[in-house]
Amino acid sequence: MKLSKKYLLAVPFFVLMVIFFVVPMAWIIVSGLQNENGASITEKYQPLVGGYSFFQSFWTSLWTATVTVLVALLVAFPFCYFLSQSKNKVFRSFVIALATAPIWSSFLIKLIGLKTLLDLVLGLALNRVGDNNLTFGSGYTLIGMIYLFTPFMFLPLYNNFCILPKNLILASQDLGYNWITSFIKVVIPFSKTAILSGIALTFFPSLTSVAIAQFLDNSNQNNTLGNYVFTLGNNGYDSAIERGRASGAIIIAALITFAFYFVVIFAPRIVRLIQTKCLKYRRVNV
């Protein structure tokens, strides 16, 4: 009976997952594999697999998202650690509220504010005050992603450091570790789960972002994955083939992402499991 009550508490979550994730993904997969208007699956996927634009867009989004994650992690990790060591709870709450403030406001308002600030700074530097189209290049897209998605790295890390037992640090110092060694050998391993959570919260939105590149990069070369799929989706209103190609682009990007996730997360576990089995087998035979 107790077990059934636990399952009942999970019902709303699974219902929402089915409605907002499983059903849309199923529709995307079916749409991507259907023959639209007499076009075969080969004709639908050939511009994606054989074309340069898709993989160029995916590569651009991949390196941009990777740099965003690295910068966010380098900024958030020491900041959250030293903030969690403060004994003043009011100060900690105030600072973390300021650090995560961009999450509270509208996405569009944040983009407008950042674009205005960048145009003002560039206008003063180039003596072109009043010109609202001075942000050219993917560097401004990267600045926007770092600004918008870094707060998502703060929350899991800060919560993790707040529950970090101080006894671990004291024990490492008793063993002769200095604070740098304790940080590397104690704090970072303890924060592994929080780091992975922060990376997921930062990486995937950066990888699939649409509006940031369109809004901040005026070079008309904002060929990110999100913009590529968005363009195909817009053309899909008039062309079923383009709509199918958009679905195909999402499927290919998802497969590449899941393959990368498998290599990073599950492959090391499988290797360790195989090594453990081999060691046990050798011990039994010896």
UniProtKB/Swiss-Prot annotation:
Residues 58-264 form the ABC transmembrane type-1 domain. The chain crosses the membrane at residues 10-30, 62-82, 94-114, 136-156, 193-213, 248-268. It holds the Pfam family BPD_transp_1. GO terms for biological process: transmembrane transport. It is found in: Cell membrane. It is a multi-pass membrane protein. SUPFAM superfamilies: MetI-like. One of its GO terms (cellular component) is plasma membrane. Keywords: Cell membrane, Membrane, Transmembrane, Transmembrane helix, Transport. InterPro entries: MetI-like (IPR000515), MetI-like_sf (IPR035906). Required for the activity of the bacterial transport system of putrescine and spermidine. PANTHER family: INNER MEMBRANE ABC TRANSPORTER PERMEASE PROTEIN YDCU-RELATED (PTHR42929:SF1), INNER MEMBRANE ABC TRANSPORTER PERMEASE PROTEIN YDCU-RELATED-RELATED (PTHR42929). Belongs to the binding-protein-dependent transport system permease family. CysTW subfamily. This is Spermidine/putrescine transport system permease protein PotB homolog. It comes from Mycoplasma pneumoniae (strain ATCC 29342 / M129 / Subtype 1).
